Curated annotation (Swiss-Prot):
PANTHER family: HEAT SHOCK PROTEIN HSP-12.2-RELATED, RE23625P. Keywords: Stress response. One of its GO terms (molecular function) is unfolded protein binding. Belongs to the small heat shock protein (HSP20) family. SUPFAM superfamilies: HSP20-like chaperones (SSF49764). Residues 59-167 form the sHSP domain. One of its GO terms (biological process) is protein refolding. The gene is hspC1. Signal peptide: none annotated. This is Small heat shock protein C1. It comes from Rickettsia conorii (strain ATCC VR-613 / Malish 7).
Length: 167
């Protein structure tokens, strides 16, 4: 008996929803809206609000993300990064082994009348260097919010294969 009731209730709901034109039609007069339509609209509005919340969050992330470009030339590699709002004291470029570390950090605390405002903006990149990068002569510059890192290339001499004698 319980199984037949479980199947019967959803069947009734489907029949009501499919037969009621006011529910199926979004172009209805709000004064003549059925309670079920009002509930459906409330759910639609909540889902739309959730979608908009994530949409705005993603667009905020995209607008604040660091844009970069890696250019390969015959005698050098060039890394160009857009870092608006950063000055050179807030950016560090370091080499350790075959890794290039690029970090930026801005922390500001502004005291307003009755509240504290904090701004924290940072980025962190780790780039594996090719073996033909002359690590001793890497240079960087910052101009108008554009960080440019020059990675000079050196010629790598291929070692000739030598045969190892087996004892």
């Amino acid at each position: 008996m319980l199984k037949s009731v479980r199947l019967y209730i959803p069947s009734i709901a489907v029949m009501i929803l499919s037969s009621n034109i006011a529910i199926a039609n979004k172009n209805y007069d709000a004064g003549n809206a059925t309670p079920l339509r009002q509930v459906a609209d409330l759910i639609d509005n909540q889902i739309t609000n959730i979608d908009n919340l994530f949409k705005n969050r993603l667009s905020l992330y995209e607008s604040n993300s660091i844009k970069s470009n890696f250019i390969t030339k015959d005698k050098q590699y060039i890394i160009v990064m857009e870092v608006p709002g950063f000055d050179k004291s807030q950016i560090k470029v370091k080499v350790n082994g075959n890794k290039l570390f690029i970090t930026g950090n801005i922390e500001e605390k502004n005291k307003a009348d009755y509240s504290d405002n904090y701004m924290n903006k940072n980025f962190n990149y780790v780039i594996s260097l090719y073996e033909d990068v002359d690590q001793a002569n890497i240079s960087s510059s910052l101009k108008n919010g554009i960080l440019t890192i020059i990675l000079p290339r050196i010629e790598i001499k291929e070692q000739e294969a030598r045969e190892i004698v087996i004892d």
